[in-house]
């Protein structure tokens, strides 16, 4: 009840904490212990054990931060999202090195869309059990611009206010945009179905850099270039682009 967004992220009858929300909470932990710095991104984020909840179940999570260190003009904070097992032992759900900066650098030039063909489904059929499991809170994809063996592109909605998803949020505004980030992972699922007839779920992100303190309120364009692929896994570069100015908002 405290986290109503979880009702829209259910797999096999269990609520699953989205990786995009893990990112938000870990970034908040890093910022909280390093006041005055801004969230710039992360390195080497890996989900080791997903956070799942059955109906009526609760689970205690802790964000653990290490000592920050400077590297290449930014501040790097080791962060872990941990839980407690039934035997009382603590274990790690997710870890990353959160990157903070005194001032966000100017964004790079956004990559061009890869060559795309028309997507095979109308947008009304994207959020169906045979494609995307996501409920209403995570219906972030407005339009699939196109899809091909090399990638996919889409227009996505912005996240609502944190209070729409969480009864007592840690902040009154997002550090990133969890709906935009989650939508990029959704697009990889759609791409995987088109290419290999199966879904892919995110477990690792090597590098994320954000060049604006906040995502545009109008939403974003997502451009994905698949760099490595097989029937069992795929790797991609993902750009979040301001559809109005063409500026690069963020890059995975």
What is the role of each PLM region?
Residues 1-252:
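Acyl-thioester-processing domains in fatty-acid/polyketide/NRPS systems
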């Amino acid at each position: 009840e405290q986290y109503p967004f979880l009702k829209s992220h259910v797999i096999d009858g269990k609520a699953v904490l989205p990786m995009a929300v893990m990112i938000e909470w870990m970034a908040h932990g890093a910022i909280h212990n390093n006041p005055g710095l801004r969230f710039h991104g992360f390195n080497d984020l890996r989900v080791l054990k997903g956070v799942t909840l059955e109906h009526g179940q609760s689970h205690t999570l802790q964000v653990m931060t290490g000592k920050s260190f400077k590297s290449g003009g930014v501040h790097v904070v080791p962060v872990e999202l941990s839980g407690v097992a039934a035997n009382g032992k603590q274990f790690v759900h997710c870890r990353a090195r959160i990157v903070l900066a005194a001032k966000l650098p100017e964004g790079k030039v956004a990559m061009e869309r890869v060559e795309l063909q028309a997507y095979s489904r109308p947008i009304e059929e994207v959020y169906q059990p045979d494609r995307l499991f996501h409920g209403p809170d995570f219906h972030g994809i407005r339009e699939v611009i196109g899809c091909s063996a090399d990638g996919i592109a889409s227009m996505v909605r912005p996240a609502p206010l944190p209070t729409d998803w969480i009864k007592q949020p840690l902040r009154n505004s997002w550090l990133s945009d969890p709906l935009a980030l989650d939508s990029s992972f959704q697009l990889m699922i759609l791409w995987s179905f088109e290419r290999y007839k199966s879904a892919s779920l995110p477990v690792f992100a090597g590098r994320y850099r954000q060049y604006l303190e906040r995502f545009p309120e109008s939403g974003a364009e997502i451009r994905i270039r698949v760099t490595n692929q097989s029937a069992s896994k795929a790797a991609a570069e993902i750009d979040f682009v301001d559809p109005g100015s063409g500026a690069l908002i963020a890059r995975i």
